[in-house]
Amino acid sequence: MKKRLFMFSVMLLSIMQVALAQVTTAALTGKVTLDNTNEEVIGATIQAVHEPSGTRYGAVTNANGRYTIQGMRVGGPYKVTVSYIGYKNREVSGIQLQLGETYNQNFTMSEDANVLGEVVVSGKASKFAAEKTGASTNISNTQMMNLPTIDRSITDIARLSPYANGMSFAGGDGRSSNFTLDGSNLNNNFGLTSALPGGGNPVSMDAIDEVQVVVAPFDVRQTNFIGGGINAITKSGTNTYRGTAYVYYNNENLHGNRVDNADLGERGKNGTTTYGFTFGGPIVKDKLFFFANAEYSKSPNVVNRWRASEDGKADATNYVSRVPVSDMEKVKNFLIEHYNFNPGSYTSFPAEDNNLKLLGRIDWNITNEHHLAVRYNYTKNKAWNAVNKSSSDAYTRYNTNRLSQYGMSFAGSMYSQNNSVASISADLNSRFGANISNQLLFTYTDIDEKRVTSESVRDESSPLVMTSPL
């Protein structure tokens, strides 16, 4: 018997290790009592309805008059009704559930031998946050849409938490923090920076329903990270077809040039254009729903501002290198004539960063006790970079930059960082009776970070840099 118990404990711990940071739902709890005696009502029926989608949840009060419904859909509004034979029905509407939190809603019931009707209470004050599990900040979709944001990123939104600074929380290293999307971990597995994969933003802001920022939570579902984390859930379809189309644009004219009395001078030309749409609705009313989002953004990138000099004299203020045009031409012609290798232009460094995001989600109310959500998203980001600018001579201890007033490069030395992220999650929330609930969550994430050379370089040649003599 002890051996079986030990094996069961090991299996349970193993399952818990796989289930890391799985916060995708909300919960509802409360107590039902009589209004005149404050006596607990045993066996009262609780029914909660997510009004936009018609999703229904049910529970029965226990011997202490308490009820709990786990695995509920985040958001609302919800309408909650309590009924018991011989008593007036009680109803509360307008309840909003927040991610990872438990909403507390109590009811008092009065006897009614005739049971003529029901009493409706609307707009009741929220009793939310009675079941906090650590310092947390919940950010609704309405707040996200009204919040000014520069780069439309998760970390930009997370600053509503007083602990957050990018992916750093309470002064901790951002690489020790955690980010989940519908329960899937989407962290920078390479660990070189604290930025999220997919160019720092693996999902469109218009596809997110709610964000929760947590710091040192003691919820056992949120583990395997130090300090803080961001949990986000995506939008779902409802019984109403809804869609949006949007375009965002910004350039250097939307940036200031002065700080106090200091003039920073003219800003270089830059701009970002973003196109996208969302669309969702019912496949089968009250039963099956879909939601889709696509977004594409492009931004011209200035990889190298430096130009070769006409007379061999450097002008750092105007980004003129002391490497003469004649030397650049000699090297280029030599490579073409003798090796049939074109290193590219030294006057033009064309580069355009772009980012594509796709997301699709299906929600299925299998029964009132079983609800399934399946989500897939894909992000591809392309960002251009110049050749590594640092250079060090071990013998002379001379340090300089390859792209500076001392050196120049050809466009063929550029390379792009091609980041792609594919993620899928399947989340089944089930309730078995009044006291048992279960979440079965399957997630898979594939992150690929490639380095690709410029279009003008397709062989194994090393990036070529021309540096003038000292």
Annotate the PLM regions.
Residues L20-S122, S126:
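Periplasm-facing N-terminal accessory domains of Gram-negative outer-membrane beta-barrel systems
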Residues N62, K88, S93-N106, G117-S236, ...:
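Periplasmic N-terminal accessory/gating domains of Gram-negative outer-membrane beta-barrel systems
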Residues G123, A245-N251, A292-Y296, V374-Y378, ...:
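Transmembrane beta-barrel strands of outer-membrane/channel proteins
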Residues I154, R175-S177, G237-Y241, D286-F290, ...:
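Outer-envelope beta-barrel architecture signal
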Residues T193, D206-Q212, V220-G229, K235-M328, ...:
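Outer-membrane beta-barrel translocator/receptor signature
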Residues L196-P197, N261-G265, G344-S348, S409-M414, ...:
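Extracellular loop and loop/strand-boundary signature of outer-membrane beta-barrel proteins
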Residues V215, T234, G281-I283, W364-I366, ...:
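Residue-level signature of outer-membrane beta-barrel architecture
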